[in-house]
Curated annotation (Swiss-Prot):
One of its GO terms (biological process) is response to nickel cation. This is Putative nickel-responsive regulator. Belongs to the transcriptional regulatory CopG/NikR family. It comes from Anaeromyxobacter dehalogenans (strain 2CP-1 / ATCC BAA-258). GO terms for molecular function: DNA binding; DNA-binding transcription factor activity; nickel cation binding.
Length: 139
């Protein structure tokens, strides 16, 4: 069942939102707002969970492979937590930069700790931990 709601937005904010949803290919504002709400709920589930529930997340890392021992540090963290690493993809972006994408699974607090450890490793140019969900609790 769908419920209709109303929201109030400043003109400039609405214009930017409409531009964003057009760029992303949404057919209407409702779909875009539903996705934003789902994303917020997934983020909350990760941060507010007791840490015992099994969670899945994706970690994205970009780094210079020529950086002193960085690749070894990242590999060491992964091997220390090998049971949590479901999959790893390594891409050579250019002659110096690598993209690493990891799928992690385990207790929520362990997944977050490992992901944050990887992202915070000195020399990582870009890193992001993205929680994932099967959507059972999202309606």
């Amino acid at each position: 069942m769908l419920e209709r709601i109303g929201i109030s937005l400043e003109d400039g904010l609405l214009e930017q939102f409409d531009k964003l949803i057009a760029e992303k290919g949404y057919v209407n504002r409702s779909e875009a707002i539903r996705d934003l709400i789902r994303d917020a709920l997934v983020q909350r589930a990760f941060t507010e969970s007791s840490g015992r529930e099994e969670r899945v997340a994706v970690v994205t890392l970009v780094y210079d492979h020529d950086s002193s021992s960085l690749a070894q540090k990242l590999a060491h963290i992964q091997h220390e937590n090998h049971r949590a690493v479901v999959s790893a993809l390594h891409v050579h972006m250019d002659p110096h930069n690598c993209l690493e994408v990891l799928v992690l699974r385990g207790r929520g607090k362990d997944v977050v700790a490992m992901g944050e450890s990887l992202v915070a490793t000195r020399g990582v140019k870009y890193g992001k931990l993205v929680p994932a969900t099967a959507g059972h609790d999202l309606g």
